[in-house]
Swiss-Prot record:
Gene this protein is translated from: acyP
E.C. designation(s): 3.6.1.7
Name of the protein: Acylphosphatase
PANTHER family associated with the record: ACYLPHOSPHATASE
UniProt keyword list: Hydrolase
Domain of life: Bacteria
NCBIfam families noted in UniProt: PRK14451.1
Gene Ontology MF, one: acylphosphatase activity
Catalytic activity line of the entry: an acyl phosphate + H2O = a carboxylate + phosphate + H(+)
Length: 91
């Protein structure tokens, strides 16, 4: 059985104004991941995601590249305990 957990990621580079959050939401929904993504004032994107461990690994791999017009310089990750979210939201 696959373990459920959450992760918080901070993504820096050209990640705002390139549909990063909307693309993350689309993929998260396909992978049945819940949580949220938001822009930060310093130009980074913060993502909080919860789901099955194997799906989170796939999602994290995508976060390290982002959508077509993005340029990801750094993507940090912190694993966190499971939290039950209903959907994936763009904040």
């Amino acid at each position: 059985m696959t373990k459920e957990l959450c992760m918080r990621c901070y993504i820096s580079g050209r990640v705002q104004g390139v549909w990063f959050r909307a693309s993350a939401k689309k993929l998260a929904e396909q992978l049945m991941i819940s949580g949220w993504a938001r822009n930060l004032a310093d130009g980074r994107v913060e993502v909080f995601a919860c789901g099955k461990e194997d799906k989170l690994e796939e999602f994290y791999t995508w976060l390290q590249k982002g959508p077509l017009n993005a340029r990801v310089d750094v993507c940090t990750r912190e694993n966190l305990p499971w939290k039950d979210y209903i959907s994936f939201d763009v904040l």
